[in-house]
């Protein structure tokens, strides 16, 4: 039984720091360590059959093995990947990055052999003496089986028993001279590469090898204390992730050199407590570049992971606090066109686009892209979207906003994306989806997801609750009421109040309390739309009316004044044209009479491919 473990492996791991070996060890004990609000960490006491060591730490991505009961006291496991970290006081910690449980705790049932605590001061001779003493007095577990043959160590190195090689497929002998694991910076001093998870503000000399998963644009500021600029990075290695920020001179120095998805050695930055309000990075600390910071390319970093996600289900967003930062993954069920808006705080124009993401829960969330992300987004093939660090808003339910610090990946190469794509292609695309976002003030009202026929909207009493309801439908225009559909409005940008003709060449706006030599036309169009089953009167304001008529309001105003016949033809040509309508319905009371008011929020040409696909899916669902 003792031969089943990689005897001598602990010494090789600690003394030689040879991380290429894959030892087979037994878990003796597991102890959780409190980490505040972070994910729990687990400290392990492990045995190689010869020695025990309590300085094993489990990487957080392996926590599920403990929490699921696979990794437990007495189980035997093979370590596939580990890192040795030297603490400030000289003690060494082995961080287990990847391991496989070979025999469960139930199958093993007890401690294998009589291992003794490992002491770094012991030489190999003392350990061999201990081993001989153990073999002379077999343990109850090993007395029942003949001792396994074990090759003698050669040139001062420890071998691994052949029984273990047969049982677990491990054949590489321990004791092979290990590399230094040191980085030689340009200054000539050696710095040890340490995992990100081990960084603390109390360390002065350190180097990490990390992949850049996100790089912000350069941002500037100006206030009473001066002005400056900055950019930030998100870095990841096998142990965790960290955010780094460069200011002023460091921006000029490092911004042109660092590329997203490349791997670099980072040395000597200032570490401080992280501000979680502005970052979704899972680390209690963040890094700031300074005059001593060094960044060197690493050509051998292909093994490092890419972006680390901790996904929140769309259905779980309703329990998240306002302004919380979350990682989300979903299929782009539908999307709006990019529009330009002016940010009031700095009077700067920026692009904005709403997309509607759905996951396997069938829930849909409105997600807003900004700037370059909004302009370049292509949702025509309904891609999988993974977003790290989106901000939760509570406006009208729950919605998300992508920040400048967020990471957006289209069709990421991760298992969750493949699973979601398979589900959507096989069954998800037939679902209407249930929106957790309710944009009551306009827009697409939560996305084109709540598909209804006009008959379904009426029979389900949509709009008769306390809040307005939204639905999407495909219908044809059957009648347009052109009488009084246009009015002369205040020409100022933010005012649409009807003006009064002063009969002296001026037009007065009561709201602005001003007179103007001109006006602009505004439109409120009543339309009757119908599908195969039902019809509905709807009100169309400026943009939706223009989309139906195919002409802008100013041109229509000129036609009405100069060419009544051409004006009539515009309305006639719009009849019997089909559109996809996004409609808001709400019960309103006027003069003691209650009725459902239907307002068109958005009008788009029918995507007949998508429409046909949904009809076929509905037919199959009802067969």
From Swiss-Prot:
Region called Disordered, residue ranges: 116-163
Keyword Ribonucleoprotein: no
Modified residues (Phosphoserine): 393
Location of N-acetylmethionine modifications: 1
Record-listed cross-link Glycyl lysine isopeptide (Lys-Gly) (interchain with G-Cter in SUMO), residues: 458, 586
Modification N6-acetyllysine, positions: 172, 176, 268
InterPro entries in the record: Euk_RPA1_DBD_C, NA-bd_OB-fold, NA-bd_OB_tRNA, Rep_factor-A_C, Rep_factor-A_N, REPA_OB_2, Rfa1
UniProt PTM: DNA damage-induced 'Lys-63'-linked polyubiquitination by PRPF19 mediates ATRIP recruitment to the RPA complex at sites of DNA damage and activation of ATR. Ubiquitinated by RFWD3 at stalled replication forks in response to DNA damage: ubiquitination by RFWD3 does not lead to degradation by the proteasome and promotes removal of the RPA complex from stalled replication forks, promoting homologous recombination. Sumoylated on lysine residues Lys-458 and Lys-586, with Lys-458 being the major site. Sumoylation promotes recruitment of RAD51 to the DNA damage foci to initiate DNA repair through homologous recombination. Desumoylated by SENP6.
Oligomeric form and interacting partners: Component of the canonical replication protein A complex (RPA), a heterotrimer composed of RPA1, RPA2 and RPA3. The DNA-binding activity may reside exclusively on the RPA1 subunit. Interacts with PRPF19; the PRP19-CDC5L complex is recruited to the sites of DNA repair where it ubiquitinates the replication protein A complex (RPA). Interacts with RIPK1. Interacts with the polymerase alpha subunit POLA1/p180; this interaction stabilizes the replicative complex and reduces the misincorporation rate of DNA polymerase alpha by acting as a fidelity clamp.
Family affiliation: Belongs to the replication factor A protein 1 family.
Purpose of the protein: As part of the heterotrimeric replication protein A complex (RPA/RP-A), binds and stabilizes single-stranded DNA intermediates, that form during DNA replication or upon DNA stress. It prevents their reannealing and in parallel, recruits and activates different proteins and complexes involved in DNA metabolism. Thereby, it plays an essential role both in DNA replication and the cellular response to DNA damage. In the cellular response to DNA damage, the RPA complex controls DNA repair and DNA damage checkpoint activation.
UniProt name for this protein: Replication protein A 70 kDa DNA-binding subunit
Native species: Mus musculus (Mouse)
Gene encoding the protein: Rpa1
């Amino acid at each position: 039984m003792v031969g089943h473990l990689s005897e001598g492996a602990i010494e090789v791991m600690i003394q030689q720091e040879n991380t290429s070996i894959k030892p087979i060890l037994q878990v003796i004990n597991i102890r959780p360590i409190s980490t505040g609000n972070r994910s729990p960490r687990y400290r392990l006491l492990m045995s190689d059959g010869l020695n025990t060591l309590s300085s094993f730490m489990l990487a957080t991505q392996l926590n599920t093995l403990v929490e699921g009961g696979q990794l437990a006291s007495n189980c035997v496991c093979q370590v596939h990947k580990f890192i040795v970290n030297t603490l400030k006081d000289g003690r060494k910690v082995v961080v287990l990055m990847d391991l496989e449980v070979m025999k469960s705790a139930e199958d093993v049932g007890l401690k294998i052999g009589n291992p003794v605590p490992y002491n770094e001061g012991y030489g190999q001779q003392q350990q061999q003496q201990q081993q001989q003493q153990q073999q002379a007095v077999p343990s109850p577990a090993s007395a029942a089986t003949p001792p396994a043959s074990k090759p003698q160590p050669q040139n001062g190195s420890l071998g691994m028993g052949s029984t273990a090689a047969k049982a677990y497929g491990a054949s590489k002998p321990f004791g092979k001279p290990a590399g230094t694991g040191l980085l030689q910076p340009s200054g000539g001093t050696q710095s040890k590469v340490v995992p990100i998870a081990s960084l603390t503000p109390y360390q002065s000399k350190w180097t990490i090898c990390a992949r850049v998963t996100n790089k912000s644009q350069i941002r500037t500021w100006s206030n009473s204390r001066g002005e400056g600029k900055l950019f930030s990075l998100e870095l990841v290695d096998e142990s965790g992730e960290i955010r780094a920020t460069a200011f002023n001179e460091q921006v000029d120095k490092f911004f042109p050199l660092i590329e997203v998805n490349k791997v670099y050695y980072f040395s000597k930055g200032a570490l401080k407590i992280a501000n979680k309000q502005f970052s979704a990075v899972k680390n209690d600390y963040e890094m700031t570049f300074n005059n001593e910071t060094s960044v060197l390319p690493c050509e051998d970093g292909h093994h490092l992971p890419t972006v680390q996600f901790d996904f929140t289900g769309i259905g779980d967003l309703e329990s998240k606090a306002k302004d919380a930062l979350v990682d989300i993954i979903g299929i782009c069920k539908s999307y709006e066109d990019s529009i330009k808006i002016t940010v009031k705080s700095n009077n700067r124009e920026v692009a904005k686009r709403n997309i509607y993401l759905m996951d396997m829960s069938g829930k849909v969330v409105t997600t807003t892209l900004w700037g370059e992300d909004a302009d370049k987004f292509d949702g025509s093939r309904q891609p999988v979207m993974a977003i790290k660090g989106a901000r939760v808003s509570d406006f009208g339910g729950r919605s998300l906003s992508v920040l400048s610090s967020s990471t957006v990946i289209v069709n990421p190469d991760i298992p969750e994306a493949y699973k979601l794509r398979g589900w959507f292609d096989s069954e998800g695309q037939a679902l209407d989806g249930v929106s957790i976002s309710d944009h009551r003030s306009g827009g697409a009202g939560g996305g084109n997801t709540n598909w209804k026929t006009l008959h379904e909207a009426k029979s389900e009493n949509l709009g008769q609750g306390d809040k307005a309801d939204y639905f999407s439908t495909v219908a044809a225009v059957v009648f347009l009421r052109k009488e009084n559909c246009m009015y002369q409005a205040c020409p100022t940008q933010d005012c649409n109040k009807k003006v009064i003709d002063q009969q002296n060449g001026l037009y007065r706006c009561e709201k602005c309390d001003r007179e103007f030599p001109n006006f602009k036309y505004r439109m409120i169009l009543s339309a009757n739309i119908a599908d195969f089953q039902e019809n509905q009167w709807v009100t169309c304001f400026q943009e939706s009316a223009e989309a139906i008529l195919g002409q802008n309001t100013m041109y229509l105003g000129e036609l009405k004044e100069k060419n009544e016949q051409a004006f009539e033809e515009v309305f006639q040509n719009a009849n019997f044209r089909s559109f996809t309508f996004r409609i808001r319905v709400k019960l309103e009371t006027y003069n003691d009479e209650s009725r459902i008011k239907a307002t068109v929020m958005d009008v788009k040409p029918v995507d007949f491919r998508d429409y046909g696909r949904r009809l076929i899916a509905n037919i199959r669902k009802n067969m």
